[in-house]
Amino acid sequence: MSTRHRRRTRRGIAATTAFGVLALTPGLAWASATATPADAATTAAAAAPDHLDDLPFRDPDLSVDQRVDDLLGRLTRTETISLLHQFPLPVPRLGIGQFRSGTEALHGLAWTTSHEDGAVHTATATTFPQAVGLASTWDPELVEQVGTVVSDEARAYHAQDPDLWGLNLWAPVVNLLRDPRWGRNEEGYSEDPTLSSEIATAYGHGLTGDDPFYLKTAPTLKHYLGYNTETARDTVSAVLPPRALHEYEEQAFEPVIRANAATGVMTGYNLINGRPATADPSLDDTVRSWTDRTLFNVSDAAAPLNLVASQQYYDTQAEADAALVKAGLDSMTVNDNDPQPTIDAVQDALDQGLLEWSDVRTAASHNLELRFRLGEFDPDGGPYGDVGAVDTAAHRALARESATAAQVLLKNDGGTLPLDPATTGEVAVVGPLADTLYTDWYGGKQPYSVTPVDGIAARLGADAVATTEGVDRITLRDAETGRYLAGGAGSAGGPLAATADSPDTTAQFDVFDWGEGVVTLRSAANGKTVGFNWSGFANDQEQPNGWYVQQLFRIEERPDGDVVLRYAGYDSAESWSPSFATPYLVVADDGSLQLGARTADEATAFTRDVVVDGTAQAVAAAEEADAAVVVVGTMPFINGREAHDRTGLDLAAGQEALVRAVREANPNTIVVLTSSYPQTIGGLQESVPAILWTTHAGQETGNALADTLFGDADPAGRLTQTWPRSVDDLPDTMLDYDVVGSRQTYLYDDAHDPLYPFGYGLSYTSFRYSHLRVADRSVAPGDTVRVSVDVTNTGDVDGDEVVQLYTHQRTSRDDQPVRQLRDFDRVHVRAGQTVRVHLEVPVDALRHWDVTRDRWVVEASTHDLLVGASSTDVRARASVRVDGERIPARDLTRVTQAQNYDDADGTTLVDTTKERGTSVAATRDGAWVAYEDADLTNGARSLVASVAKAGDGPARLEVRLGAPDGRLVGSAEVPATGDARAYADVTVPIRRAAGRQDVYLVLGDGVRVSTFHLTS
């Protein structure tokens, strides 16, 4: 990427201490004030004698290594071991307070857990668009400003309570969004590694601050590595062949670490090629090789326990913890706030000789160095000790700017948008998301909320806005007793019971359709959502929420027209998720609503009556309006989240029907689609004139929407993911991580025509690209390809254009991407103006992983340079010749890792040993792996393979040429080796093999191959 994206023009954010601050008061409530909270270092050291400031580890003039060594020398063995836990022991005698890793800050300061009781504490802090929305700005400079605000607010909370609010932030998430069915799609940035790493680097730089040594906060990249599924996420293995691993998955992490925009990684729950990610040696071997800075690597919550429990990888926690430390993990997030089990397990590992004290000391030093860089042990708290401001005017303005910049205009037929406020009389703002803002699992509490209705009313005046949610209000009457189901009348709500004689508001419920049969019920009496509370059901929740969302239902119709209710909360596919044997609801003898039936036939039948027809209300409002804005979409706690993947991408049927009805009533209908992931909305694309997409964009959502709808801002967000026409365009399984082999994402998928391509987005103006120039048409490794293009705003309004540079390698030994993003720039162009945009790509970035030699290679080839407005909208093109290498024929006389195949079928990748190595494993008889273009010109006498075979009885290993069923040139029996990780050499005599050949190893079921080589 160009240096422009590296670092960093600041726009509009002065030092936050210059603004009026909302200072923290005891109890974490907010009060208006201008005072800056006391710095954390002063607070932590308050109980320490003054002479402690004279200790060497508190001397900022010493090197960090000297300070770490001095402090480690003063700690007891137990205190040192405790540094390997999320909540290490405080050391009052040295003035060291409670440290904690892990404050959530994905798109604003969000929440933390208490060291005292493990309880969750939520921050009231500036809330920005979800991460996928921040990336949709395609504006690293803006995202860096967001990171700056988040780190300022983290410092403010830390100053108020340093024991509770740590400065090691668990953000950003850089897992690539290769499949929109992933429940945590909203947390990531893009399906593209270049865009993801650029946005993550920008956010990370905002979080870390500008000091060359000290850190404002310490961001941690999540989740290393190959983590894209919630279903059984702690036992699923991400199968990553070398090219998918090195070219795709690692490239979301590596550039961020190299840019010093993160201080470590969090490991995923999953396994990587059969080995738990928490114990993968690449944490040390690979991740630490990307930087000369010390990294602090942490586990995800409770993941260390999985190695013994769900994964059954080790028999004891001592073995597991020893493996984690040796692999490069520094901190274990486990057993909530109690470090003692970790202390005991690590001490046990030391006693057994599974760990050396130097291993523990190294991990502990990583913890301490991070804290030194955060200024914790400096007498004055370091340069960021007095930074801290929350919800200032500047922060609010940035929240609005980022929410506006993230919006993507998907359709705009006939210039439907922008609406002219001078000629637009009344606007109907309808839909289930018209007058509410939803938070998500990794969002904090919004200081205030501007809904779409609020924003549009502020722009036009309240009298010019008619609004309704467009949802039905129903009653549910027990078909047997005739009594109505009702909740509590007060603001606190109350238990639901079928005891009401008449359908007053306590017996009326608004039904919100979220798709796939799932609904929520909101009480008309108090506006609270109905949920399960273990003793029954009550109308007492502000909105659906919680780790296992307990406010979800299915209303199932019986043949006689009555309905039954099925509880759909706690709907998770995690291995530890609870389940309910009796999910259907019954009315107990006392009238209370309870779980109690296994089947619909056993459930209580209710007569459902519609009190208010929501669609009819919306239609009536639309008929009287000059324009209708229908706000529909998803709810982050329902339509996929952590612990819950999606199966479909459709908009809820009830919401789509609402849009169609409003469109029929008012042709001037605009859809605002609010969602956290791509949706299959082909029907809307065909039926409405304008569609504007936004993520759940935080406290300023309504103002941002009004800015765009009325033309105060030109929409210039661009999609960071491909939007498919159908879920059928996606792979059969979410578990296929081989984007190269299975041709996933815009990079490789040339078989499907997307609804909206990667990089897509419309504008209120138009742009012409011209005069593409390439600085040098012939380049070599170490050079940089530099291009420039003129972009002219040919419309009548000023606007932003996101200029995108893609490349395509014309010739290669290996499959190459159809196109690949290399650089981009979001530029502002006034109406009639032409600007010259400069883009670049280092030639070394045109590399790919050579499986024949197990290393990076830049091939000799011509590369197409494609400049345009999206991955498919190419406006200018040129080419450049790269003077690189030519990959020679495979030399199989060298020891070859079996995983470095060109093609395979019926196999998976597994761990060679628990400590390191990757092997190919056959999952059926006749499985095969192919090694193409092997040089056998000197002949081959035998193939020697390192193999393992668990279970009883032998299996076969065959060597064939040309195809899996091609000419057989050798075979041998693979004996049972007694264990899947017990390898032995097997020699296969080879006959009549010469020339350049595609070599196939055909494997019997259960055979594992680590390495092999030919003898000649």
Task: Give names to the regions the model predicted.
Residues 860-864, 871-877, 881-1016:
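Extracytoplasmic
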Residues 10-15:
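Short, hydrophobic alpha-helical membrane anchors of single-pass surface/secreted proteins
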Residues 2-8, 27, 31-849, 862-866, ...:
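Glycoside hydrolase catalytic-domain context in secreted enzymes
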Residues 16-27:
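Bacterial N-terminal signal peptides
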Residues 778, 828, 857, 935-936:
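Residue-level "contact hotspot" at macromolecular interaction interfaces
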Residues 854:
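Extracellular/periplasmic metallocenter environments
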